[in-house]
Design a protein with these regions (language model features):
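Conserved anchor residues at repeat-unit boundaries in beta-strand-based tandem repeats, strongest
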Residues: 8-18, 32-43, 56-66, 80-91, ...
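Beta-turn initiation residues at beta-strand->coil junctions
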Residues: 1-3, 23-27, 47-51, 71-75, ...
Length: 206
């Protein structure tokens, strides 16, 4: 009980601290956490709830923070993230979802940001990008795809932009350009090809 006489915790105790299965409440009486405890900290499997009683997180806890496999929700049972957690942050393999439940991203995370290899999806369900990420942005080798699933670009990205060596493809899959890029623009040494992928121009681009 709090000083005001409202219930703040109900469940098992050991050495005067929450231990085992128990429920934590907000001051207004709304349930905040339901699950396992160890030495006064959320530890094991549990659920957290928002001020309106909506489910916010369901999964593993360690020393009071989400840890291991878990699911994060937004709104009324709308799944936002599903995957690995470490010390309260998205860390490891995971999936992000659009509000309608369709997959938005599948890949690696570090400290809540996309980091490592991952796939980004359109709302239609087709893959938009597959490749390397750093600090939440496309960074390193990667491939862009058009809505038909054909490769549109393959090359190097820097901070979310095409930058470095890269190849651009037509919608029919044939190679159009191969060469250097700078911040999304063809820049430097490059070559243009016709639909039969025969060289038609080579030189500098600005």
């Amino acid at each position: 009980l709090s000083k005001e006489g409202t219930l703040v915790y109900q469940g098992g105790f050991e050495s005067g601290k929450p231990h085992g299965s128990g429920t934590e409440f907000r001051k207004d009486g709304q349930k905040f956490y339901q699950g396992n405890w160890q030495a006064g900290l959320k530890h094991g499997n549990g659920k957290t709830f928002g001020p309106k009683g909506n489910l916010m997180y369901e999964g593993g806890f360690q020393q009071g923070k989400p840890h291991g496999q878990g699911q994060e929700y937004r709104g009324e049972k709308v799944l936002f993230y599903q995957g690995e957690w470490k010390n309260g942050k998205k860390d490891g393999s995971g999936k992000l979802y659009f509000p309608d439940g369709k997959l938005a991203y599948e890949g690696q995370f570090v400290s809540n940001q996309r980091e490592g290899n991952g796939k980004e999806f359109r709302k239609s369900g087709t893959v938009y990008y597959e490749g390397s990420w750093q600090k939440g942005k496309k960074n390193g080798p990667g491939t862009l795809f058009n809505s038909d699933g054909q490769k549109a670009f393959s090359g190097v990205f820097v901070k979310g932009k095409r930058d470095g060596q890269g190849k651009e493809y037509r919608k029919d899959g044939s190679l159009y350009y191969a060469g250097e890029w700078r911040e999304e623009i063809k820049h430097g040494q490059g070559a243009i090809y016709n639909k039969k992928e025969q060289l038609v121009y080579t030189g500098q681009f600005r």
